[in-house]
Amino acid sequence: MTAAEMKQVHDAHVAAENRRDAAAAAATCHPEGFIENVALGVRFEGHAQIAAQYAALFHAFPDAEMMQEGEAFGTDVLVAWGVFRGTMRGPFFGVAPTGRRIAIPFVNVVPFRDGLMLGERAYFDLATLCAQAGLALEDLLAGGGSLPR
């Protein structure tokens, strides 16, 4: 895919995220696609799991915003960076909401296949998330995350 084609698909994906439209975000992904949260060591595969994960994220952070600051392109891969902002108003990986607002810098690596996003690997600092959201790392991991190995 060209950089322009990847950007068009990714922009549609980010727009769906910012509308908090889980189905539309999942629709930009390849049927064999995945979403991987590297910090928490979890991976979701296929449209159903991807949509469910986005729905859970948008429930936890109903004002979620993906503020993309830049992107770079390689052969069938896009790397995007920015800041995820939101207020924790619902459970997140089994942890009760804290009502606190977060602003977490991220880097996402997004491979493409057949004109769609094959996946999204999200990298961010887990300690920053826990500190800003008022979460204990142990509680977050007990709720479904696991440290990467």
What role is predicted for each listed range?
Residues 1-149:
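C-terminal and inter-domain tail/linker signature
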